[in-house]
C-alpha cells in the first residue's frame, strides 16, 4: 500500500483513507455499478475532478501512480481515472496545460478550488493544506469552522471529520482583497483563493453518496447519449460566467463559507439577519393580502421562497457565488414574467420586492465571488481558450473578448439598470407599441363578473364545487367556469388554497397545462374562468375503452411529464395527479388541470441538485396532511413523513400503470386497506398475453419506488424523459404528433365526453342561501383578477370593431387588418398570401388563430421560460421571454390578426411569399344565426372561387382552422411550399417557438374537424397537433382554395397520374390522383399547381376513388378553365413505400361519385360521445401499435368511425362534398365503445341520453376492477377512438381499411365482448338508458321478460327523443354517395335494423337508437303510427327523390333516397336471423380479424344500417321480433323486404335477396343514381346458392359489395367487381342462429354478417314475435322511434333486420332536415313503395 507516503502527499489527494480496505471495497462495488453511468462528456462534473487528477509535477504524478496501483488492478476507480474522460468535452489529460475549454457548465468553475489540482504545475513548493478542515480532528469546537457538520444531511458529508494532517489553517494567508492576484507560480498564492478546489468528490463516498451523486447531478440540458435514465452527472450550469459550477456542495463549500463568514461578518449578518428579520417576515404571502393578480401573486410566492432558501443556505454554510448567480437569474426571469403576464399596478410591488432581495444578496454575492476567484484556473482557461480558438472550434471573435465574456464581464450593469428602469418608463417600446391598444382596452377592461357569462350547462361536479360550460356574452367564447362554494372553503379553512390554484393557473403558460382567463367572486362562490378542453378526461376514456394502446399511453404520459416538469421547475407540486385531471383537447393532446390541492414551493435551482437538498426537497412540505385521491397518494404522504415533488412522480407511476393495465395497482374497500397495500404490497403485473412491454413495466416500477429519494424523477424530469420507454420520442414535437383519439363533438356545446358525476356530488345553488359572511376573510375580496389572456379579448374586440368601422363599410364584415405588420417584431411581416376565409366572428379569429405555441425545447431547461407564446389576440398574452413581451401584447391588444408564414426554421424573418392579395375577413354572424354555424367559407380575392357552396359554414369551423394551424406545426418548411398558397400564418412571438403555417387549404372543412364552435375557447391551439397526416386525408376536401388553371390552346400544362393507396396492411386500396408533372411556364405552373401534390377535387368534385379516365373526363369537361384542389402529399397520411408483392390480389375500393350536395346538416348535432363512439366503434381497435395501419387511416379513408365519416355533419365537419369515401361512413362498430373493459357491454352511447356522460361509465364495475376504484374503469364502450386509435392488428388483412379494427381483438386483459356495438357510425341512436347494462349472455337476454323490455322501451323512448336530436343526419344524397359503395353490402347492423332499406340512407339519421325492445303491443302501435308516417313520407319522398337525383347529398331530405340502400336486398336478407350477431349485441364490432369473426358486413352500408351501437339493456331481451320477419323477407326472393330494413345482413345476400335486388335495381337506380354501384354484387355466387355465408372480404365492406363482392352484379360504371373479396371467408354463422332463425334462413342467406366475435351469438327467440309482427304488418315492419321532437315516427323496417323486441329505429330515419323539409323520411320503403316513387 501507499502507507509510506507522507501525509503531505495525501493531503493533495484530499483523503488518504481512500486506501483503507473498506473504502476500497465500497468504492469498487459502487463504482462497478455506476461506472457505466458516469457521464463521459462532462469534465469536472462527473466525479468532479477526482478522476481528472491533472497532477503535473513529478511528485504529483508519482503520487497518482502509487495511488492508482495501490487500489489494485480490479479497482473501478482506477479504470475510471485512467479512462479518457473528456470525449465530448475537451479532454483533460494528465497535463494541466492541455486542459481544453469544457463546454459551458461542464467544468466546475465555481469554486474551482475543488479540483484535485493540488498545486500549481510550475510551483516547486508543496501545496499548503487544503483547508482548515484538514486539520480538524473534530475534537474542539474551536477547531471546526462554524456550522461545519460533516454528517449533516444538508450537504454531502463526504469528507470525514478526521484528517491525517493536524495542521491548523491560518486565515492570515488569505489575501486581504479576496482576489487571488498571484500568478500560478507564486509561492505566496493563498491556498484558499488560488488553489483550493471547492468541489471535489469525496474520496471515500458511501454507496448512497455515490448513488445520489450520480443520480442527481444531472441537467436537462444535455441529452443522454444512450437514452437511459441519465444518472450520470451532467453539466448543470447554463452560463459561462465565472465561478458557476454545477455541483457546488461539498464540505469544501462549508469551508469557503467559514472563511467568508470569518472575513466578512457584516456581509454575513446582512445575509442572515436582515432578510430573516425584515424581508421574509414582512413580505410573506401570509402576512399581506393576496395580490389581486394571480401571476404576480405566484411570483410573490416564489420570491419569498427564494429568500427563505437563501437564508437557509447561508445559515448552513452552503452558499456559493454560483448559487447567487442562479438566484439572480431566476429573480430576473420572474421579473420578466411579471412584466409579460400582468398589466396590474401590483407589478410595482413585485419589482420592489425583487430589488430588495437583490440588494440584500448583492454584497455577499460579490464577496464570495472574490473569495472564489481562482487565478490559476483563469490561466488554464485562457490557455484552453487560445488552443480552442486556434483549432478553429468556433470562437470566432477575438480571444480577449471571448475571455471577458467567459468571465461574465460583458454585461453592462448600467445598461441593465437602464433597462430595469425602462420597464416602468412610459417610453418603452412596449408601451409605445401598445399605447393605442391599451387606450382601447382600458375602458373595456372592466373587472369580470358573473353577468359577463351565460351558463350553458354543467360539465362536471367535484368535491368543492362544479364546473360549468359558459359563454362570454360579448366575445361569444366558450370557457369552463369552476365555481367553488365560499362557505365550504371558509369552513375547511382552505381559502388560501383557492388562491394558490388561481395563482398557478394564471401564471402557468404551458401547452400542456390548462390556462385561466379570469377569476371573480359572487355572493356565494369563487369563480375561475378557464379554457374549455372539450375531449373529457382520461378517466372517462379509461372507463370507456379500458387499457390504452401503448403508443397512446406513451404520448399521453410524455405530455403529462412535460406538464409536470414545467410545474416542478416553478416549484409547483400538484399533489392530485390522476387521470381525472388530465384533459384531452380537441386535437387529442393532454392538458393538466385542477390545482386545488397544489402547493407552491421553491423554483428549481441547479445549485440545489445535491443530496442534501434533494432530500430536503423531497420533504419540502411537513404539513402532515394526507390529501389527494387515495389511489394516487404516495407512501410518504400516507406515513406523514413530509413530502415534495416526488409525490407527483408516484402518482405518475400509478397513472402509467392504469393507462397500461386499465385499473390502478393498489385498491381496497376502504382507504385504510388501500393505504396498507400502497405501503406494503408488491405491484401485481399482468402476465401472459396481457404482459406489459418490459420498458413500460420498468418505468412504472421505478416511478413507484417506495423511497422518494430513489424514485425516478426525484432529481428531475430529465431522468424520466431519458427512460427507454420513450426511446425515439421527439420531446420537442409532441404537439405535432398524431393523437390516436380525437374527440368528435357534435356541437360546440357538446360536453358528452365529461362525466357530470351528479350522483356523487351535488352542489345546490340555492339562491336563498345566505350570503357568506366575509368578516375575517377579507382576502376573498382579492380573488377577482383578470389575466392578460382575458383582457386581450376585450382589447382585441375593440380593435376589431375599430378596424371594422375604419375599413369595412358593411356593418356585418370585420376585416382583419394587417396594418400592424410593421409592429410585429417577432412576427415576420405579413407577407404570406392570406387566404381569406370568413369565419364566424372576430372572436373566432382571436381564439382560433392565436397560436399558443410551446417551445418545448425550453421545457428541458430549468424553469421553462414561458412556454407558450400566444399571438394574435388570443386571450393568452404572449409570453415570449425571447422577445419583448410588447409585441405580442401589442398585437393582441390591437386586435391585429397577424398570420405569418413562418420561415422554415421558425425564424421570424419574412417569408418570400407573394404579397397578400386578400384580406382576412371575418364575417360576422347574423344575429339569428346559431353560433354554432360559421358562415360558409368564402374566398374573397381575385382568382379564388367562392367556396361557400362547397364548404358549409361548419366546414370552416374553427376547429378546422385550429387543426390547420397545427398541422403546420409538423414542420413543413415554408420553403417547401412557398409558391403554394399559404394562409398567413400566425407566428409566435418568439422565433424559437413552434411556427404554425396555416395553409389555406386548411380552411375548407377539415374532415376531422370536430364541431367546435368558432367561438369556442377550446383548448389552446397549442394543444392541437399539427400532424399532417391526420388532417389531410388523402381524399379529404381541399382545404385551400382551388387552383384555377386557364387552358392555353389545348394544354393545361400538367400531367396527372392515378396512384394506389392501400389501406393499412390490407390488400384493399383506393385510387388517388396526383400531379405527376407540371410544365414550366405552362398555365398550371403559373396558377400555382405543384408537382407531387395530391389532387383532391376537380371542379369541386372529389376525385378520391375515381379512376384515371374519370378524372381526365372531369378535367376535360370543364372547358378552358379547370379548378383543381390539391394538398401536398406530405400533408396527408399517405406513406410512400415499395410496391406490394401481391398487388395482383389487391382490390380497389371505389366509391360512388356523389355530388357535394348541401351540407345541410348544420343544425344537426352529433350525438353524444358514445354515439360517436358507435360511429367509431370499429375504430377502437385495441391492437397496441398503430403501425399496421400504414396509412394510418388517413382521414380520407378513415374508418367509418372516423370523424371523417361521421355524416352527421357536425357544424364542424366538412361538407359532405369534402367527405371522403362514403364507405367510411359505416363505422362498423358504430359503437366503438366496444368496451375493452370486461363490462364492455355498456351502452355505447350513454352520453347520448341527455348529455349525461357515457352511460355506464360509472355504473358497471368492470370485472377487472376492484370495487374500490370501480367507478373508473367501466366499459370502454362509449368513447370513440380516433381512427388511429388502435392499430389494426396486422393479421386482419381483410379488415376494411376504412375501419380500424375494433379493440375487441385487443387487450386480452379486457376481453371485449364481441358485442361490439355496430351502430352505424351515423346513427347515434344509442341513447340507451345509462343504467341499462346489457345482459351478459344471449341466454339472459332471451330469458328477459317482455315486461322488462316494455319498461326499458318506455325509458328508451324518453331518451330517444333527445338522442334523436343527435342523430347524424346525412342528406340522402350524401348517404347514397357514401353508402352506395357499401350499401351493396348489407349493413350488418347487428341488432339494429340495418338501414339498408331504401330508407336506410337515412344513415345520416340513422341514429341507432337502441331502444329497448318493445313489447308486441308497443310494436303494433308503432306500426300503426308508422303506417301513417309512411304515407306522409311517401309523399315527401316523391319530392325528395327528385331532389336526390339532383342533389345526391341533399340534406337528409332524401329519405326517399334511402331506398338506394335497399338496393341491397341482400343486405336485408343478410340481416340473417343470426341476429347478425345480434344475439350478442348487435353492436358488436367487426373484429379486426375477419376470419375469426366470420363474415363481415359486406360493403357495410355506410353505417346507415349499423344498428345503433346498441348496448343491450340488461332488461332487454334480444330483439326477437323483427328478425324472423326480416329474415323471411330476405328469404323470400319475391318479397323485397322493405328496403328500409337495415338489419344486419350476412355478408352474402340470399338468392331471394338477389332477386329482390334485381327487381328493384331499376327503381333504386332511379332513386339513387349511385345505386348501381351499390348493388349487392358483394354476395358471392356461392353463397347465394348455398345457404351458407359466402366469404366476404373486407374489401366488400370497404368498397361496397359492388366492388368487393365476387358477383359484382352491378359494378359502378359497369366495372367488374373483384371477386377476390372472398379473401375473407365468413364463418358459417348459421350454427349460431337459433333454430327458428335457421329455419327462415334461405339457403342463400349467408351467415350473419357479424360473427359474434368472442361472445356466443345470442339466439333470439324472436321467431314468434316476428311472425306476429309479420302477420300484423307483413309489408313493412317499421318501428317508430320518437325523434328528437318527440315524434315517434322512426321507421325501422322490421323484417329485413331482426328487431329485437325493442324495436330499434333504423339508422335510416333521418332526423328532420335542417330546413325541416323532411319530416320523417325514415320509413323503409317496401318494394312497392319504391316502385311508386320511381
From Swiss-Prot:
Binding, ATP: 459-467, 482
Subcellular location: Membrane; Cytoplasm, Cytoskeleton; Cell junction
Entry annotated with the keyword DNA damage: no
Catalytic machinery residues: 576
Modified residues (Phosphothreonine): 1446
Entry-linked Pfam families: DUF1908, PDZ_6, Pkinase
Compositionally biased tracts (Acidic residues): 1441-1451
Catalytic activities: L-seryl-[protein] + ATP = O-phospho-L-seryl-[protein] + ADP + H(+); L-threonyl-[protein] + ATP = O-phospho-L-threonyl-[protein] + ADP + H(+)
PTM characteristics: Phosphorylated and ubiquitinated. N-terminal ubiquitination leads to degradation of MAST2 by proteasome-mediated proteolysis. N-terminal phosphorylation appears to be a prerequisite for ubiquitination.
Modified-residue entries (Omega-N-methylarginine), positions: 942
Domain AGC-kinase C-terminal, residue spans: 727-795
Domain PDZ: 1042-1130
Tissue: Detected in round spermatids and residual bodies but not epididymal spermatozoa (at protein level). Expressed in adult but not fetal testis with levels increasing in parallel with testicular development. Also expressed at high levels in heart, lower levels in all other tissues tested.
Ranges of compositional bias, category Polar residues: 112-125, 137-150, 173-184, 883-894, 1532-1549, 1617-1627
Cofactor(s) named in the record: Mg(2+)
Residues covered by region (Disordered): 112-197, 216-246, 421-451, 802-834, 849-895, 919-947, 1005-1032, 1133-1484, 1501-1553, 1606-1734
SMART domains for the chain: PDZ (SM00228), S_TKc (SM00220)
Role description: Appears to link the dystrophin/utrophin network with microtubule filaments via the syntrophins. Phosphorylation of DMD or UTRN may modulate their affinities for associated proteins. Functions in a multi-protein complex in spermatid maturation. Regulates lipopolysaccharide-induced IL-12 synthesis in macrophages by forming a complex with TRAF6, resulting in the inhibition of TRAF6 NF-kappa-B activation.
Name assigned to this protein: Microtubule-associated serine/threonine-protein kinase 2
Organism: Mus musculus
